[in-house]
């Protein structure tokens, strides 16, 4: 594993991380790693979307169907 040093972290961010760590009974470092792990997963989103099959549905048709369903509620 690599070591990551963060500088210029705003005080309010540190305070919130400290509160989360206290609630989870863990360290600020563990909370920061957990949160960065979750946030970094977004980097995979374009590839995931690119791998989806094109099912040939026109977006206006799709949105029209959603609007019709919502109107029927």
From Swiss-Prot:
Keywords: Toxin-antitoxin system. InterPro entries: Ribbon_hlx_hlx (IPR010985). One of its GO terms (biological process) is regulation of DNA-templated transcription. Antitoxin component of a possible type II toxin-antitoxin (TA) system. The cognate toxin is VapC9. This is Putative antitoxin VapB9. It comes from Mycobacterium tuberculosis (strain CDC 1551 / Oshkosh). The gene is vapB9.
């Amino acid at each position: 594993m690599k070591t990551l040093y963060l500088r210029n972290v705003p005080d309010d961010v540190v305070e919130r991380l400290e509160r989360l760590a206290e609630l989870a009974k863990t360290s600020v470092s563990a909370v920061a790693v957990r949160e960065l792990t979750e946030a970094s997963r977004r980097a995979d989103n374009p590839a995931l979307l690119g791998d989806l099959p094109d099912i040939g549905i026109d977006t206006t048709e799709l949105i029209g169907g959603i609007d019709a369903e919502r109107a029927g509620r």
